[in-house]
């Protein structure tokens, strides 16, 4: 899933001195990766909601962002099909599931599983033809404390799009904010499903509310020949 984390706009692709930023590495350093992601998502109620559901933590329980971030990305380091990438000494971090994929963690909450896993999996199968695999971007975040470094998120997308293109793969992600959706559209992703989750559990700020509207998110998919091969 890709959460609301104030991603830079598409034009923010240079550092403060006008120098293109483009150093990407794979990493197994869970501590550093979790640190960046916890900064990126510290003020994201959707991040906390989703992670608490997956980790089966009561919604009303206060848990440090660093703690749930570390726990939520650990399966990707433990699996041969998981991959964590970082750019510019952890200025940005992305967590990936590669074919044949890290099994999606399921919550004890059947409704959440339906809304956020089962319905989306079914839609992905409708959109992506048989014979085409896909990369799944679980989450991506920028260190918002490093305002002078730009282009890190762009570098991640450009590299993984290049890899996916070479392998004739699609890329799948969930965007939970309009701003993030706009950024992903710039990078060639299209929205194939708008969906709700957390209804009658929380309000849009993540506060427990039995009448709450929950959150709105978007299932977005990229393929180099998307207009030709992806199904509406």
Curated annotation (Swiss-Prot):
The keyword Nucleus appears for this protein: yes
Gene3D superfamilies (UniProt xref): 3.40.630.30
Where is this protein primarily located?
Answer: cytoplasm
Keyword annotations of the record: Cytoplasm, Nucleus
Q: Where in the cell is it found?
A: Cytoplasm; Nucleus
Q: InterPro entries recorded for this chain?
A: N-acetyltrans/Recomb-assoc
Q: Which GO terms describe its cellular component?
A: cytoplasm; nucleus
Q: What else is known?
A: Present with 6020 molecules/cell in log phase SD medium.
Q: What is this protein called?
A: Uncharacterized protein YDR391C
């Amino acid at each position: 899933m890709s959460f609301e984390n104030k991603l830079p706009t598409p034009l923010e692709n240079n550092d403060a001195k006008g120098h293109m930023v483009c150093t990407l590495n794979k990493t197994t350093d869970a501590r550093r990766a979790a640190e960046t992601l916890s900064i990126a998502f510290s003020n994201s109620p959707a991040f906390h909601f989703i992670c608490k559901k997956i980790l089966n933590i009561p919604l009303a329980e206060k848990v440090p962002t660093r703690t749930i971030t570390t726990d939520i990305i650990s399966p990707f380091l433990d699996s041969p099909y998981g991959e964590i990438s970082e750019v510019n000494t952890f200025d940005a971090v992305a967590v990936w599931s590669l074919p044949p994929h890290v099994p999606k963690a399921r919550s004890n909450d059947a409704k959440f599983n339906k809304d956020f896993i089962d319905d989306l999996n079914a839609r992905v199968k409708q959109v992506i033809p048989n014979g085409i695999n896909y990369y799944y971007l679980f989450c991506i975040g920028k260190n918002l404390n490093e305002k002078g470094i730009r282009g890190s998120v762009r570098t991640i997308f450009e590299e993984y799009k290049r890899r996916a293109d070479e392998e004739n793969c699609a890329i799948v992600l969930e965007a939970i904010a309009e701003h993030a959706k706009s950024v992903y559209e710039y990078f060639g992703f299209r929205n194939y499903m708008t969906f709700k989750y957390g209804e009658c559990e929380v309000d849009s700020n993540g506060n427990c509310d039995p009448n709450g509207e929950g959150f709105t998110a978007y299932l977005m998919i990229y393929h180099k020949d998307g207009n030709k091969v992806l199904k509406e």
